[in-house]
Amino acid sequence: KNVLDEVCRMFPSAYIHLGGDEAPKGNWDKCPDCRSRIEKEKLKDSHDLQLWFSAQMADYLKQKGRKAIFWGDVIYKDGYPLPDNVVIQWWNWRGHRDLALKNAVRHNYPVICGTNYYTYLNFPLTPWKGYTQARTFDLEDVYLRNPSYRPREENPLILGMSSALWTDDGVTESMIDRRVFPRILALAEQMWHSGNPENFDEFYGKVLSKQLWFEQQGYSFGPALKEDAGTNYK
């Protein structure tokens, strides 16, 4: 709570992201303090413990007039109830498809869509460093096959879409622009677009027409399609 006090003093945002993803419960199951807390609070298991802790932190933020964002992992299973100031960020399409999205909507939680297929711009265009063909994507994949593209008309609980570029797995500064551009243009088009999108060929033509402008602004513009990348593209 001391940390949240400091965060709230520093950042006026209505939303505070509290994480909650990739918390394997093996160590929790063996931890005497965790087992003691589970027993004391009459919780079912370690996942329920995470929900309980998440609820305490979200409630604390609620007292400050803030909303708490959690990664979708916290609602893979039902358990200890979360308060009504919670927003779920759905990310793990690769591991759990739309489980977090469905569970969030079922519990009436607003959702931010930002799946690792195809909004994680650290994922390469072509296979690289253990990223197999299944974990690559190009401009066309984003535009036509992005599971995060859920128009708000589909469900009023969908707040919108996010994108990320994680740099913890070998992505260097020199790679960043070419990972971001032009794929982020397809994401931007989906984020602000309403109604039926134009066909991909028309969109692709517009992207190519803007490449020189981006380069004149100092950005490195990567290949748009996998077939344009060649075998040495990073």
Q: Where are the language model's segments positioned?
A:
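Short acidic/His/Gly/Ser-rich catalytic and metal-binding motifs that mark active-site loops
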Residues: 25-30
